[in-house]
């Protein structure tokens, strides 16, 4: 940020500050759109090194954020999303290196054809321009979003939650160092330098054409606000009410492993399972072992009458439970009459995010994968694979559940659009 913008920030003239950030980002986007793959990769290498070198400073900043969150009564799941460890910092740096290793989508010719008049037409991937990422508690989003936007030739404006402000600032310094070492404009990755919540509203306004797309990463209230108020396109999912359906033809050992991982690996992530559906035909063999396993692992189970009958520790499920993204060690559980009723339940209560079936019956699996209208559907795998890194995208800037432009994990390629290049030899239209 320039000295003039720092002065503006100090004077609390937020609209001027935000428009200045957007203007600088737009200028940086023009440079990035023409930057070579080698130059972008040089910056990513330097960013990864800087993150590792600054681990102590990042952890110290994060410890202050976590202490404030705990003092404010944050849930354990919220604190988990906010907390950084040495292992998570290493994973963050590794994630930047993975993005460096993926193919550069910019300039990729996806189609080429020749017309009868001799003209050659090419469809070519180009950056979107300026991306605004609005997120809450996860500071690693800074590195993921910064790396992906850089690789895809986009400038990015990052607006982290006030809870992660110090952590994001420490990580952002590493990203800027990488840009500087590669000779790229520092405004290519901008962190909004204030906790003022009014900054979100200004980003949603589009900043007079300064923002091309917005990606929210956070809870339902944030995403709902972004989708309701944004004046520019949004890549988002409102919530992750994800299901695991255990079919009557499921292998019990596999089902137990998948259900436990889908719920308890990290209960607060958007790919965590929130509802367990069990086929009535297999319930005599599968239901009690699954429920016992979850409760013994520290997960609260809220079930229908059939689920309550197998374990006195199960709490009664209410109608609201089927529509709830807990983001915690809680799961709703229900017995259904086969895959048809499971699909119907998911269509009524799901969020079109991620849903899984566990079965050894290929026909049942095919029906589930075809009929469940979610961005990600899985057969015999945990819902926690709903992640751009696990898809080979390097990382993700978010998960989109809409049906326009991007759906599922939004990686570098999904952060590009296209244009048509037409080569002629003097043709004129009759």
From Swiss-Prot:
Name any GO cellular component annotation.
cytoplasm
Superkingdom of this protein's organism: Bacteria
Pathway of this protein?
Amino-acid biosynthesis; L-proline biosynthesis; L-glutamate 5-semialdehyde from L-glutamate: step 2/2
The alphabetized UniProt keywords are: Amino-acid biosynthesis, Cytoplasm, NADP, Oxidoreductase, Proline biosynthesis
Task: Write down the InterPro entries for this protein, in alphabetical order.
Answer: Ald_DH/histidinol_DH, Ald_DH_C, Ald_DH_N, Aldehyde_DH_dom, G-glutamylP_reductase_CS, Glu-5-SA_DH, GPR_dom
Q: Mind telling me which Gene3D superfamilies this protein's record contains? A: Aldehyde Dehydrogenase, Chain A, domain 1, Aldehyde Dehydrogenase, Chain A, domain 2
Name the family: Belongs to the gamma-glutamyl phosphate reductase family.
Kindly provide the name given to this protein in its UniProt entry.
Gamma-glutamyl phosphate reductase
Source organism per UniProt: Nitrobacter hamburgensis (strain DSM 10229 / NCIMB 13809 / X14)
Q: What is this protein's gene name? A: proA
């Amino acid at each position: 940020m320039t000295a003039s913008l720092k002065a503006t920030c100090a004077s609390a003239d937020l609209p001027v500050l935000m428009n200045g950030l957007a203007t600088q980002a737009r200028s940086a986007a023009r440079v990035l759109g023409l930057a070579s793959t080698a130059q972008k990769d040089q910056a990513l290498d330097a960013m990864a090194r800087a993150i590792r070198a600054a681990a102590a400073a990042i952890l110290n900043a994060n410890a202050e954020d976590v202490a404030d969150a705990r003092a404010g009564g944050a849930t354990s799941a919220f604190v988990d999303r906010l907390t950084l460890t040495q292992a998570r910092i290493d994973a963050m740096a590794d994630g930047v290196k993975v993005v460096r290793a993926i193919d550069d989508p910019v300039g990729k010719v996806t189609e080429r054809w020749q017309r009868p008049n001799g003209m050659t037409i090419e469809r070519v991937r180009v950056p979107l321009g300026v991306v605004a990422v609005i997120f809450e508690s996860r500071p690693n989003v800074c590195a993921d979003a910064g790396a992906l936007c850089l690789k895809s030739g986009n400038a990015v404006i990052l607006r982290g939650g006030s809870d992660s402000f110090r952590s994001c600032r420490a990580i952002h310094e590493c990203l800027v160092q990488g840009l500087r070492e590669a000779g790229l404009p520092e405004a290519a990755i901008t962190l909004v330098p204030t906790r003022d919540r009014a900054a979100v509203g200004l980003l949603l306004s589009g900043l007079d054409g300064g923002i091309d797309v917005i990606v929210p990463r956070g809870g339902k209230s944030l995403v709902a606000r972004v989708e309701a108020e944004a004046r520019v396109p949004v890549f988002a999912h409102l919530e992750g009410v994800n299901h695991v359906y255990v079919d009557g033809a499921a292998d019990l050992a596999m089902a137990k492993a998948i259900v436990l991982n889908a719920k308890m690996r990290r209960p607060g992530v958007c790919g965590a399972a929130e509802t367990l559906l069990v086929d009535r035909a297999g319930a005599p063999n599968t239901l009690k072992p699954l429920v016992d396993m979850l409760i013994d692992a520290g997960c609260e189970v809220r079930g229908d009458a059939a689920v309550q009958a197998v374990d006195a520790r199960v709490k009664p499920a209410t109608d609201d439970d089927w529509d709830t993204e807990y983001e915690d060690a809680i799961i709703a559980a229900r017995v259904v009459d086969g895959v048809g009723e499971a699909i119907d339940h998911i269509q009524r209560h799901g969020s079109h995010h991620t849903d899984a079936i566990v079965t050894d019956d290929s026909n049942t699996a095919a029906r589930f994968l075809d009929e469940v209208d979610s961005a990600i559907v899985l057969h015999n795998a945990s819902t926690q694979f709903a992640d751009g890194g696990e898809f080979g995208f390097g990382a993700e800037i978010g998960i989109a559940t809409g049906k326009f432009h991007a759906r599922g994990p939004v990686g570098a390629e999904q952060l590009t659009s296209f244009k048509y290049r037409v080569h002629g030899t003097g043709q004129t239209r009759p």
